[in-house]
Amino acid sequence: MAKIVKVIGREIIDSRGNPTVEAEVHLEGGFVGLAAAPSGASTGSREALELRDGDKSRFLGKGVLKAVSAVNNEIAQAILGKDGSAQTEIDQIMIDLDGTDNKSKFGANAILAVSLATAKAAAASKGLPLYAYIAELNGTPGVYSMPLPMMNIINGGEHADNNVDIQEFMIQPVGASTLKEALRIGAEVFHNLAKVLKSKGLNTAVGDEGGFAPNLASNADALACIKEAVEKAGYVLGKDVTLAMDCASSEFYNKENGLYEMKGEGKSFTSQEFTHYLEGLCNEYPIKSIEDGQDESDWEGFAYQTKVLGGKIQLVGDDLFVTNTKILKEGIEKGIANSILIKFNQIGSLTETLAAIKMAKDAGYTAVISHRSGETEDATIADLAVGTAAGQIKTGSMSRSDRVAKYNQLIRIEEALAAAGTPAPFNGLKEVKGQA
């Protein structure tokens, strides 16, 4: 048993130039874990609270000194002397100490940073790579898989300053046999997409997640540009590369009139009409996964969408489920969607994140591990994806070091597992009903 001997919180800067919380947890023997909390732009209303200072004289009110103070004081005092490998106990101590349903006293950003730093320190004390330690915490020691990347190569919505309503247009290199090959395919398509956009006189500046953010006449135009890029890269769309979208529908849903208002192309849809709009895109392009295809509160709309599309493609709940087992349980019981997006800052601790992944898998749902639009160099989600054998990961495009850091960690993990004679299987999309 290695006891926690020091806990340090600090304010650092994320990929959008906003502050976030970093935590250091020190154990006996000199073992140290360092972790930082990510931050979202389009957020579900039922996410755990990200505590900001609100002091307009610092960082336009987005400082996190209150959360950092909680780490350095109340949280540190509560967990000093505890066994660093008692992850569930430590997380529960912080949850109970906070005492709110949404971690609004200390902030999910404070609790999560300490939770992850504790896991990293404990892994180091046991001489284990983080993914192996996570697998132990998950109750699945030695069970790993390399995740299929869902690469966000055209950004819209809240992730870009353009007129594209749908937030993410992604590619999935399903023809790859390894993670490293998948990244090569993704990079080649990404660079060819830059050429396609330039040839059309379109902007090749990138958005928050490293994808291009051009102004386009329609969402279908984004898919057409990607199709051209895939072909120019020498790949076959639908065989080597498939497509995915994150609609982030809550961002353009008008609660007053119940319509999905896509201002970028001047169209409005009822709930069912929007499902059929997406169905039309799926008929035209090999789209294998759609995230948040309805507003988070439109459960009737989600039920209809699941009925229409759920047997054909992956329907991922992000704002819908917010990595929360209570909400996911209700969704499973009602047959809503067939997959959950996993963002550990939505719930605020590693223990609760693992519980959500387990609940999803036990119900036959897939779990997609995800970054946030505000990230740091922290690559914990790479280890989380491998250690839970989740099978899929969303961590942005092939640019911006805050995104590429996760891909590079996956390369290292794949290499290490192969060198140990235990190569991990690849491509979790095959688990989805209706997929090849």
UniProtKB/Swiss-Prot annotation:
SMART domains, sorted: Enolase_C, Enolase_N
EC number: 4.2.1.11
Residue sites binding Mg(2+) per the record: 246, 291, 318
GO terms, molecular function: magnesium ion binding; phosphopyruvate hydratase activity
GO cellular component, one term: phosphopyruvate hydratase complex
Cofactor note: Binds a second Mg(2+) ion via substrate during catalysis.
CDD domains per the UniProt record, alphabetical: enolase
Active site, renumbered: 209 (proton donor), 343 (proton acceptor)
SUPFAM superfamilies, A to Z: Enolase C-terminal domain-like, Enolase N-terminal domain-like
Pathway recorded for this protein: Carbohydrate degradation; glycolysis; pyruvate from D-glyceraldehyde 3-phosphate: step 4/5
Cofactor(s) the record lists: Mg(2+)
One annotated GO biological process: glycolytic process
Gene3D superfamilies in alphabetical order: Enolase-like C-terminal domain, Enolase-like, N-terminal domain
InterPro entries in the record: Enolase, Enolase-like_C_sf, Enolase-like_N, Enolase_C, Enolase_CS, Enolase_N
Reactions listed under catalytic activity: (2R)-2-phosphoglycerate = phosphoenolpyruvate + H2O
Keyword Metal-binding included in the entry's annotation: yes
Keywords in alphabetical order: Cytoplasm, Glycolysis, Lyase, Magnesium, Metal-binding, Secreted
Broad class of where this protein is predominantly found: cytoplasm
Any Pfam family the entry gives: Enolase_N
Chain positions recorded as (2R)-2-phosphoglycerate binding sites: 167, 343, 372-373, 394
Entry-linked PANTHER family: ENOLASE (PTHR11902:SF1)
Family statement drawn from the similarity comment of this UniProt entry: Belongs to the enolase family.
Functional description taken from the UniProt entry: Catalyzes the reversible conversion of 2-phosphoglycerate (2-PG) into phosphoenolpyruvate (PEP). It is essential for the degradation of carbohydrates via glycolysis.
Subunit structure of this chain's protein: Component of the RNA degradosome, a multiprotein complex involved in RNA processing and mRNA degradation.
Protein name in the entry: Enolase
Classification lineage: Bacteria, Pseudomonadati, Pseudomonadota, Gammaproteobacteria, Pasteurellales
